Amino acid sequence: GALSLCVQGLANIERAGTLTGPTSLFTLTIADSGERKSTVDNYFTKGVRDYQDEQRKALYPQVKARKREIKVWKTRHSGLLQKIKSETKQGNPIDEIKTQLAKLEDEEPRPIPVPYLIRSDETPEHLAMALRVEWPSAGIVSSEAGAVFGSHAMNPESIMRNLSLLNILWDGGELQIGRVTRESFCLKDVRLSVSLQIQP
């Protein structure tokens, strides 16, 4: 699991002439209580956890500065929209404001990507958004898989939909996420491995 997490964002594997896909793995380890599941998990994932911690610390000043830029951008964007609304009510021309708005939208700052590779308790919806916005490669890793299988995302009403989403992410396929209340988006070229341990 840890090895696939390290390489899945770097290369694909060609299994046959027309079969190419990610190196991502889904693994489930079944072990009795006291068989050191957490110890083994920590041993193999320590390097990945150390790397992502180092990256977070190194990128923190940039992330903080970018968050400020995004707040300023949102304030300016909101101000221009309010100005358009106000000028329209008064019957004034808004061409210049629309030009300013278009220019501002072209300059929208994006969050600084920070490697957040190891995840545990994730809803599929949040995982999809994180792969799009934060980092396009991740692994759901847990030595207590009961927390994953027993989560709200695995209730009878949503289990098939959520497992299908995870399967598409593992396969490296393209995934359209449609939303009514939020922005819809497309996930493409993202990578997901799953490494779970559970007691029988």
Set out the residue ranges of the language-model regions.
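Phosphate-handling catalytic cores of nucleic-acid transaction enzymes
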Residues: 1-200
